[in-house]
Amino acid sequence: MTQKEQGQGFIEVICGPMFAGKTESLIQRRNKALKLKKKILSFKPRIDDRYSVKEEIVSHNRNNIPAILIDKSKDILTFITPEINVVIIDESQFLDNDIIAIVDYLANCNIEVIISGLELDFCGKPFGPMPYLLAIADTVTKLTSICAISGGKANRTQRLIEGKPAQSNEPVVLVGGKEYHEPRCRKHHCLADIDKTKVNWKNFANQSK
């Protein structure tokens, strides 16, 4: 695909913990672009089936927009045509690392790329391709939620298994809503097997090498 003569591409990343309104913000940006008569494609990973298995992006408030379900990042390229102005991608943390090169390419083709996702997993570690997407983004919007314990600003996602904090060795991906997750601030975010008063070498072993 050749670069468009008009318009300027960019990458915007909307991130934050669960229940921060990331998908809602994504839907708002899509609707604004639609009013400007822009040609839009929306995508989400097929694995995200919390609220719908249909071809749509659904927020916690149950607002929705049409979307194409993808199994891998390269699937996006098969749908891109010269008239597309805007590409929207929800739940980007679930995608493979090819998404980094793909969104960079799309932005260089003068396409506006708007992405949402969790930048931290339930352990508080960088999640999937999100740290790289944040690094190459032209604009970053970091949203917060309300801590379920203190009522303060929450920037982390607490995983709960039968109402108790999860162990750090549990699978990173656990698709679900309030039955498994709640927003928490740094102070109240915890893991059952991690002592936060000590340097957390175990949790960040791969990142510190």
Curated annotation (Swiss-Prot):
Keyword flag Nucleotide-binding: yes
Compartments reported by the entry: Cytoplasm
One Gene Ontology CC term in the entry: cytosol
Record's catalysed reaction(s): thymidine + ATP = dTMP + ADP + H(+)
EC top class, as a word: transferase
Highest taxon listed in the record's lineage: Bacteria
Gene3D superfamilies linked to this entry: 3.30.60.20, P-loop containing nucleotide triphosphate hydrolases
Keywords carried by this UniProt record: ATP-binding, Cytoplasm, DNA synthesis, Kinase, Nucleotide-binding, Transferase
Assembly description: Homotetramer.
PANTHER family: THYMIDINE KINASE, THYMIDINE KINASE, CYTOSOLIC
Protein name, UniProt field: Thymidine kinase
Organism: Aster yellows witches'-broom phytoplasma (strain AYWB)
Record lineage: Bacteria, Bacillati, Mycoplasmatota, Mollicutes, Acholeplasmatales
